[in-house]
Amino acid sequence: NATDKNRILIVDDEPGNIKILSNVLADDYALSVAISGAQALEIAKVQLPDIVLLDMVMPEMDGIQVCQALKADETTKDIPVIFVTSMSDTANEERGLDAGAVDYISKPISPPIVKARVKIHIQNYLSKRFLENLLSDQDATLDDAKKEAESLLVFV
């Protein structure tokens, strides 16, 4: 069932690159595709994917700008971003990581490496979300207990 699968947003302006990543990931994940930075931001805000695979070189809005915009938005800031790009030099890798990406994969891709990295980053993201929700629930329980204790002290 596709609704039970983790969601990946693939962002690339080249149909061939989208096809390659889709072929590698379609069996295990629910995929969405954006062919521009603006479209990627719209889809990410609505669908809240579990990870974004982002090309660095795109017209109008490049991958760095998309990543920075995702990280600046409260609803998308925690979604992990992996750059998947032909820009394989260290300077661009550093730019991508500085923009907020969790990983950087150079093209041509190795399907097993892409699958492994996507899997581990989604697991980390979901674990973080689970722990944040658990902590939030415990904070609420503590607040309730504190209010109850304070109300009891009024009667003492």
Where in this protein do the model-derived segments appear?
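Receiver (REC) domain active-site loop signature in two-component systems and cognate sites
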Residues: 58, 96
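Two-component/phosphorelay signaling modules centered on CheY-like receiver
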Residues: 3, 15-33, 46
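The feature encodes the CheY-like receiver
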Residues: 18, 59-60, 77, 89, ...
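Active-site beta3 strand of CheY-like receiver
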Residues: 47-53
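C-terminal output helix
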Residues: 91, 108-118, 122
